[in-house]
C-alpha cells in the first residue's frame, strides 16, 4: 500500500464521536461558550430552558456538546443526560463570588454521580474578561479541586465572550477523550 492510499484512508476515516456534557449554574456562560465553539453569533443569548446540542469538529473528533440549562428548577433533570458522557465541562462564573459555594456543591454532587464516575472533567473559570473575576487558581483552591483523585481534571481560565482560553480548554478535552478511568 502506497503512502497516498494510506493518507486517503486516514483522511476518509470518520471522526471519533465524543459526547460532552456542558453544565454549570444559570448565567455561568454555557450557551455563550457553546456558540463560541460553533463560531456562531453570541450577541443575543437567552437563558436555556431545556438544552442545546451542537456538533463541532476538532482534531479528528466530532464533539457532540450538550448544553443543559442551569436554573435551579432544571438541575434535577441533569441526571437524565449523564448516560454515555465522555467528558464533563463544568462552567463557573468567576466574577460571581456570591455563588461559589453553590457552584461548588453542584460540582461535588456531579463528581459523586455513578454514571459520571471517572469521566474526565474540564472546569472553565469563565468571565475572566471582567475585572471582578477570581483567578482560576483561587477557584481551584476554594473548590478543593486538588482532592479529585478518581479522574483526570483541569481548570482553565477563559472568556466565552472574547474566546480567550476556550481553545486551550478544548485542546485538553481532545487530549483526554480516552482518559476515562475504568
Swiss-Prot record:
Phylogenetic lineage: Eukaryota, Metazoa, Chordata, Craniata, Vertebrata
Residues recorded with modification Phosphoserine: 5
Protein name: ADP-ribosylation factor-like protein 3
Keyword terms of this UniProt record: Cell cycle, Cell division, Cell projection, Cytoplasm, Cytoskeleton, Golgi apparatus, GTP-binding, Lipoprotein, Magnesium, Membrane, Metal-binding, Myristate, Nucleotide-binding, Nucleus, Phosphoprotein, Protein transport, Transport
Primary localization: Golgi
Cited function: Small GTP-binding protein which cycles between an inactive GDP-bound and an active GTP-bound form, and the rate of cycling is regulated by guanine nucleotide exchange factors (GEF) and GTPase-activating proteins (GAP). Required for normal cytokinesis and cilia signaling. Required for targeting proteins to the cilium, including myristoylated NPHP3 and prenylated INPP5E. Targets NPHP3 to the ciliary membrane by releasing myristoylated NPHP3 from UNC119B cargo adapter into the cilium.
Keyword hit for Metal-binding: yes
UniProt note: phenotype after gene disruption: Lethality by 3 weeks of age. Mice exhibit abnormal development of renal, hepatic, and pancreatic epithelial tubule structures. Mice show abnormal epithelial cell proliferation and cyst formation. Moreover, they exhibit photoreceptor degeneration as early as postnatal day 14.
Organism: Mus musculus (Mouse)
Assigned protein family: Belongs to the small GTPase superfamily. Arf family.
GO CC list: axoneme; centrosome; ciliary basal body; ciliary transition zone; cilium; cytoplasmic microtubule; Golgi apparatus; Golgi membrane
Cell division keyword on record: yes
Ligand binding (Mg(2+)): 31, 48
Mutation effect (residue 98 to Q): Does not reduce the interaction with RP2
Coiled coil: none
Result for mutant: residue 49 to L: Does not reduce the interaction with RP2
SMART domains to which the protein is assigned, alphabetical: ARF (SM00177), RAB (SM00175), SAR (SM00178)
PROSITE patterns: ARF
Annotated compartments: Golgi apparatus membrane; Cytoplasm, Cytoskeleton, Spindle; Nucleus; Cytoplasm, Cytoskeleton, Microtubule organizing center, Centrosome
InterPro entries documented for this protein: ARL2/3, P-loop_NTPase, Small_GTP-bd, Small_GTPase_ARF/SAR
Binding positions for GTP per the UniProt entry: 24-31, 48, 67-71, 126-129, 159-161
Record note on what altering residue 71 to L does: Does not inhibit interaction with PDE6D
Membrane association type: Peripheral membrane protein
Lipidated residue numbers (N-myristoyl glycine): 2
Assembly, per entry: Found in a complex with ARL3, RP2 and UNC119 (or UNC119B); RP2 induces hydrolysis of GTP ARL3 in the complex, leading to the release of UNC119 (or UNC119B). Interacts with RP2; interaction is direct and stimulated with the activated GTP-bound form of ARL3. Interacts with SYS1. Interacts with ARL2BP; the GTP-bound form interacts with ARL2BP. Microtubule-associated protein. Does not interact with TBCC. Interacts with RP2. Interacts with PDE6D; the interaction occurs specifically with the GTP-bound form of ARL3.
One Gene Ontology molecular-function label: GTPase activity
Entry's Gene Ontology BP terms: cilium assembly; Golgi to plasma membrane transport; intraciliary transport; kidney development; mitotic cytokinesis; photoreceptor cell development; post-Golgi vesicle-mediated transport; protein localization to ciliary membrane
Amino acid at each position: 500500500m502506497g503512502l497516498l492510499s494510506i493518507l486517503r484512508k486516514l483522511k476518509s476515516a470518520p471522526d471519533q464521536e465524543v459526547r460532552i456534557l456542558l453544565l454549570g449554574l444559570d448565567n455561568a456562560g454555557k450557551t455563550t461558550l457553546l456558540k463560541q465553539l460553533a463560531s456562531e453569533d453570541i450577541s443575543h443569548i437567552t437563558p436555556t430552558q431545556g438544552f442545546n446540542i451542537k456538533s463541532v469538529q476538532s482534531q479528528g473528533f466530532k464533539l457532540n456538546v450538550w448544553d443543559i440549562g442551569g436554573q435551579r428548577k432544571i438541575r434535577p433533570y441533569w441526571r437524565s443526560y449523564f448516560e454515555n458522557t465522555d467528558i464533563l465541562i463544568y462552567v463557573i462564573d468567576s466574577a460571581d463570588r456570591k455563588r461559589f459555594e453553590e457552584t461548588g456543591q453542584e460540582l461535588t454532587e456531579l463528581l459523586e454521580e455513578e454514571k459520571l464516575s471517572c469521566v474526565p472533567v474540564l472546569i472553565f473559570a469563565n468571565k475572566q474578561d471582567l475585572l471582578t473575576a477570581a483567578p482560576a487558581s483561587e477557584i481551584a483552591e476554594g473548590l478543593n479541586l486538588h482532592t479529585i483523585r478518581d479522574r483526570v481534571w483541569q481548570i482553565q481560565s477563559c472568556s466565552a465572550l472574547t474566546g480567550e482560553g476556550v481553545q486551550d480548554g478544548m485542546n485538553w478535552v481532545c487530549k483526554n477523550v480516552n482518559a476515562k478511568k475504568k
